[in-house]
Amino acid sequence: MKSITVIIPVYNEVESLKELHKELTAVLSGNDNYELLFIDDGSSDGSINTLNELSNSDYHTKVIQFYRNYGKAAALAEGFKVSSRDYVVTMDADLQNPPEEIHKIVASFEEGHDVI
């Protein structure tokens, strides 16, 4: 399987981060070549502390911190800039999109689609 980056912009999502991380790692457990790239967009609710805990306990998890809120577009742009994997998937931190959809997205990439 090709390598995957999942970019997750975060703004004051401390309540959902551990569950999101748990679900993402479960979904991606069959592929050791992935990274979870959380971009903290100036959160003020302690999200960065939770993200740092997750990063310290899981080498697949990377964190970038913005010191003020620049917006989702800036967070995504930064994620795309630093990603080094074959496929890039974006996901909201609030679990609005089920992490299980990642496999469908990757399958579409493997069929030759550039944007899903």
Task: Give each language-model segment a name.
Residues 1-116:
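Structured catalytic core of nucleotide-sugar glycosyltransferases
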